[in-house]
A protein has these predicted regions:
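Extended, highly charged accessory segments
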Residues: 1-287
Length: 287
């Protein structure tokens, strides 16, 4: 029960929160044509954590930041995800391109093209947008996120709306069209015609257009011209403490019920689990 009191003040509030979207059960796997990478479909846990709010004046300027402590809001839905190959992380690290910004940009590029394959409105499918306060911080974060592109149905409850199911079915075309859109756009850092989204709750602050092409090409098993990539850190993606770790396989509830398309049994072998320490960094050092 919440109690509301009417007051006259010169400010409004804006919620401060972040959302973790994590697959918890694989229901179907689809091999991406011409690639060793796979797309997965299944149950997604969406956990929203509200940690405070801003007070904004009439010109929407921040005049105060207030911290609150609330329990997380957790719900479940259906969605699709793609685990990013280690080779992409190696290249991004070598060129000092921000990994979280690259993931965020690639997710936006794919999201923008979903209406090409299923009738939907902007916002019907969502992703985990990256928060600049965390991604560009100069101190270690306890909230490490997997190197994964994740998309989930915003409507339909635990059963989903079916839109992400269609995206899963057409994932090969989605990836190719997203890459073509990124490469055809003449902007330098990203815009709404390629990797930015007008619906991004974090105002597209964490973006790497160059990094998104590395991720998309690696998923499609396409050749990547490393020397043609810019050397970071990029102007709008300053280097911070790494917040991304290798994605771990999400097991099915029952292998007998798992739908597999061009995937061998060993795809869920324990050997596929990995840690970030397996990746060699550009400087030959550690995390």
């Amino acid at each position: 029960m919440a109690r509301v009191e009417k007051v006259n003040v010169e400010w409004i509030t804006k919620q401060r929160d972040y959302t973790d979207t994590d697959p918890i059960e694989t229901e179907a796997i689809k091999r991406i044509n011409g690639s060793l990478s796979k797309a997965f479909y299944g149950t997604i846990k969406i956990q929203q954590n509200v940690f405070g709010f801003f007070k904004l004046d009439k010109k929407k300027r921040v005049i105060d930041a207030v911290h609150v402590s609330n329990p997380p809001v957790i719900r479940y839905g259906k969605g699709m995800w793609l685990d990013i190959p280690k080779k992409a992380l190696l290249i991004l690290t070598e060129r000092r391109l921000h990994i979280a910004a690259s993931i965020h940009a690639a997710e936006h590029a794919i999201l923008s093209l979903m209406p090409n394959f299923v009738i939907s409105m902007p916002g019907d499918v969502r992703t985990e947008c990256k928060v600049a306060l965390k991604e560009f911080a100069q101190k270690e974060s306890q909230r490490k996120r997997p190197a994964r592109l994740t998309f989930y149905d915003a409507k339909g409850g635990a059963s989903g709306s079916g839109i992400s199911t269609k995206a899963f079915e057409h994932v090969d075309h989605l990836l190719k069209q997203a890459l073509a859109r990124v490469e055809a756009c003449w902007c330098e850092h990203g815009c709404v015609e390629c990797v930015a989204s007008e619906l991004c709750k974090q105002a597209n602050e964490v973006m790497s257009k160059a990094g998104s092409s590395v991720i998309l090409k690696s998923l499609l098993n396409m050749e990547i011209d490393i020397e043609a990539l810019p050397m970071g850190p990029e102007e709008y993606s300053p280097a911070g403490i790494e917040t991304v770790i290798l994605a771990q396989p999400v097991p099915p509830r029952d292998r007998a019920l798992l739908q597999e398309v061009g995937v061998k049994e060993e795809d869920f072998d324990e050997r596929e689990t990995a840690t970030w320490n397996e990746v060699q960094f550009w400087d030959g050092g550690s995390t």
